[in-house]
């Protein structure tokens, strides 16, 4: 069945483009599991024009927008600089332009984008002989006021097998970790530096969110962090990051779950993903996200012991029909999560009661 689009020439009071869709029509992204292709149009070209210098460079792989007036570009061969992510001023790239770009991408990819449907994924037309780039757009109310965008371009390189030869493979020899019992803070700082995935466990009012913010502050400022939470309580550790907000669907707004946002987060080029709290079906998506190239991620869970935290995660994962037994699910969770930090409150004081490496909890 074809997507039914309702296009308006004006802008609604919310400031979002009025591009809706029939509730009876399936989302092409969720139905087919891939971004919808986008036909080329003069309007799309006009809205992408400020990004043309980077879209036309073969060495550029990522173009990111976190806030108005600037972009972040990952360039393997920049002019006059070192390879990597660079922050660039681009005054034209404001929320209004991103709204219009989202409207165009939605229209010609047969999708919807408005405050009820603030997530949009698509594949842009091919430019300069390159394969089509993938674009992810996230708008309010699923963000902290501003639009977020990521364009990922594939570099097509023809390299011989010999190009991957760096000589004999030497096993990595990391220095020992600090003792978690004697030096818990030094241990955690080193675990964060080494990109260990950390789960914070504790009961109600044990300070899990406050502690999570303290850990976020230890992440190196040059790493890109994507936050996923119900309310904006977490603090981005650096300039290159974005916060996504789950929406419950009240007052005619979007119903966007943490699971939906995790799928979008994977397309926003994160170094680390931080999920405010594991509660249900998003557990499997979080574990898979970590296991597919995002180590060093964090989350929290309600549990009274480190072993109980892994048991809780296994239970929530099994409710998603993961297809594994309880023992297999527990082992999988322990293989993905490196460290469990247990918090408690004694005599009104919150603190760390235990730090456990996950593999010791299921042995």
Ranges and model annotations:
Residues 1-130:
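N-terminal accessory targeting/assembly segments
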Residues 65-67, 75-77, 124, 139-141, ...:
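Flexible glycine-/small-residue-rich
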Residues 81-194:
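P-loop NTP-binding catalytic core
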Residues 181, 185, 195-201, 214-336, ...:
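Switch/coupling sub-region of P-loop NTPases
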Residues 191, 201-204:
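P-loop (Walker A) phosphate-binding loop of NTP-binding proteins
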Residues 208:
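Conserved lysine of the Walker
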Residues 211:
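Hydrophobic positions on the alpha1 helix immediately C-terminal to the Walker A/P-loop
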Residues 331-363:
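Conserved P-loop NTPase
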């Amino acid at each position: 069945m074809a997507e039914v689009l309702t296009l308006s020439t004006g802008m609604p009071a919310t400031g979002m483009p009025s591009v809706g869709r029939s509730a009876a029509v399936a989302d092409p992204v969720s139905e087919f599991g891939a971004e919808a292709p986008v036909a080329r149009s003069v309007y799309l070209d006009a809205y992408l024009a400020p990004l043309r210098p980077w879209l036309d460079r073969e060495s550029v792989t990522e173009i990111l927008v976190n806030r108005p007036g600037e972009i972040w570009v990952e360039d393997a061969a920049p002019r006059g600089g070192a390879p990597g992510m660079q922050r660039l001023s681009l005054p034209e790239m404001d929320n209004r332009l991103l709204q219009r770009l989202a409207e165009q991408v939605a229209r010609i990819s047969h999708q919807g984008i408005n405050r009820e449907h603030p997530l949009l994924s698509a594949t842009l037309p091919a430019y300069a002989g390159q394969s089509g780039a993938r674009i992810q757009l996230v708008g309010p109310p699923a963000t902290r006021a501003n639009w977020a965008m990521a364009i990922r371009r594939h570099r097509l390189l023809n390299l011989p097998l010999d190009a991957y030869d760096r000589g004999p493979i030497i096993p990595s020899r990391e220095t020992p970790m600090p003792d978690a019992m004697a030096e818990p803070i030094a241990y955690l700082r080193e675990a964060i530096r080494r990109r260990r995935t950390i789960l914070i466990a504790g009961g109600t009012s044990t300070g899990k969110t406050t502690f999570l913010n303290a850990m976020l502050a230890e992440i190196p400022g040059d790493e890109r962090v994507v936050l996923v939470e119900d309310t904006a309580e977490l603090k981005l550790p650096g300039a290159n990051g974005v916060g996504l907000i789950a929406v419950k669907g009240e007052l005619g707004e979007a119903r966007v779950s943490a699971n939906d946002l995790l799928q979008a987060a994977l397309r926003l080029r994160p170094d680390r993903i931080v999920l405010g709290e594991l509660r249900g079906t998003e557990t499997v998506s979080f574990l898979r996200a970590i296991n597919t190239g995002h180590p060093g991620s964090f989350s929290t869970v309600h549990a009274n012991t480190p072993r109980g935290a892994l048991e809780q995660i296994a239970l929530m994962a099994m409710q998603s029909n993961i297809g594994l037994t309880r023992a297999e699910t527990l082992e999988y969770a322990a293989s993905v999560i490196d460290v469990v930090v247990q918090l408690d409150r004694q005599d009104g004081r919150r603190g760390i009661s235990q730090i456990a490496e996950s593999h010791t909890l299921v042995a």
